[in-house]
Amino acid sequence: MIAMDIREIGLRLVGEAIKAADPYRAVLNAVKVSDDKIIVQGKEFEIKGKVYVIALGKAACEMARAIEDILDVEDGVAVTKYGYGKELKRIKVIEAGHPIPDEKSILGAKEALSILNRARENDIVFILISGGGSALFELPEEGISLEDLKLTTDLLLKSGAKIHEINTVRKHISKVKGGKLAKMIKGTGIVLIISDVVGDNLEAIASGPTVKDPTTFEDAKRILELYDIWEKVPESVRLHIERGLRGEVEETLKEDLPNVHNFLIASNSISCEAIAREAQRLGFKAYIMTTTLEGEAKDAGLFIGSIVQEIAERGRPFEPPVVLVFGGETTVTIEGKGGKGGPNQEIALSATRKISDLEALIVAFDTDGTDGPTDAAGGIVDGTTYKKLREKGIDVEKVLKEHNSYEALKKVGGLLFTGPTGTNVNSIVIAIVTSKRGRT
């Protein structure tokens, strides 16, 4: 094992995770150009005509910049969140609304359709998708206004409908979701996707504009009725769904298209693998425990802490030195007035109760660099943190109950700061155990 401070090791592994999810780097790693061929993850595409780019999501500009740097781009559009825009050589940049779509979201989609209309059968169209694309890139179906679409989404959000149910309805009142964008590609579509969805379900990322969709107009109506909002949504939405049920409006994409190829180029899983590789290079055994971690943050922290305790005290299920990696997205349920913090800060703080006095470190962070509504990416704690908190008179149980993890961790140097990373592949927890208790 390389002689390094445990905190230094933790920070290095965080860096590897973020590097693996960097949009610019991810595109360059995935796409190679050789003579008159484009090679993506081993699949070859012949360059016979022009190259166009349509990028949508928070990482749109960085992904588009990478394509511009390796190919001669004829034209393109990048639709991203306000404040995320960067000037590109040939590609037009449009900043739009997120998480609520606005007129610029529609403008971005119209620009994209204009490009698809110009692209011929021998051309290549790159579609670059990242988190936030669902709101940033929108074009309601005929007869449905942006306000109607926003009201429908708002009613669904307030009804308690699950995210996949909300997306089912949205796909059936949008011209670009549920594989409908793919239907408009006449040439070769090369789709590069950065996943911000736990489990990497491509249908769920930006509401799946380029992948087949199993849901139907029947499902959309059933969901609106189930949550008792069928009569509350705008008449234009009801009429469109009724037309779909009668077969007068085309369904979402039901079969993969032979000319459209989807590639996952960055995800929580890919970042977790990068951590494991670097940990092994540093002399640790490394295990990816899950990439679908969900549930209440403080419970996840206690559970991860208890695994670390078992390893450090009994050498099971793994002997130290070892690195465990957990990917996913946990939540914080706030009742009453919450304090300052985020799910990853709660994971770290909660884990301190289990790893006190152990040769161990836990770092929990959001890969976008922002954990909850704070300037911290997450929390970083070790075997000394719990004692330091007690010495400062901080009651961990009370702080967790009040959801005030930021202030508690701040007092003991337990906050992790990365700054905005320009990417998002959800959250990651890294647990490092260097030796068993009583051993150095």
From Swiss-Prot:
Q: Does the keyword ATP-binding apply?
A: yes
Query: How many cofactors are bound and how?
Result: Magnesium. It could be replaced to some extent by nickel, manganese or cobalt.
Output the Gene Ontology cellular-component terms. cytoplasm
State the reactions this protein catalyses.
Answer: (R)-glycerate + ATP = (2R)-2-phosphoglycerate + ADP + H(+)
Q: Which cofactor does it need?
A: Mg(2+); Ni(2+); Mn(2+); Co(2+)
Print the keywords alphabetically: ATP-binding, Kinase, Nucleotide-binding, Transferase
- For whether the record's keyword set contains Iron, the answer is no
Per the UniProt annotation, how does pH influence activity? Answer: Optimum pH is 7.0 and half of the maximum activity remains at pH 6-10.
UniProt lists the family membership as follows: Belongs to the glycerate kinase type-1 family.
Q: Which PANTHER family match?
A: GLYCERATE KINASE
Q: What is the official name of this protein in its record?
A: Glycerate 2-kinase
Species for this entry? Pyrococcus horikoshii (strain ATCC 700860 / DSM 12428 / JCM 9974 / NBRC 100139 / OT-3)
